[in-house]
């Protein structure tokens, strides 16, 4: 059995798609609109992004999506790039056996980057 898709309700679907393409290499599907976008990972998992009202975009405190990296150096590089581009990201640290950091992504959800 293969997980096919996951839907995230976000503040702005297009902005979120462009962010995920730029920093995590997801492939966006052209078309759609600010309210509905689709991205794919390297395994063709479909992540649908649907715009919700600000009061509807609320995730539980522990909810996040994670992007595993091949090395700690890759984690550091993504962290530095996000920081240089003005995102509020904490420095990576050793947690649950991984070199990792969590941050609030555009769209209203948390991303973990780990290696």
Residue ranges with predicted function:
Residues 3-11, 57-115:
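Vicinal oxygen chelate
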Residues 7-47:
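Core segments of cupin and vicinal oxygen chelate
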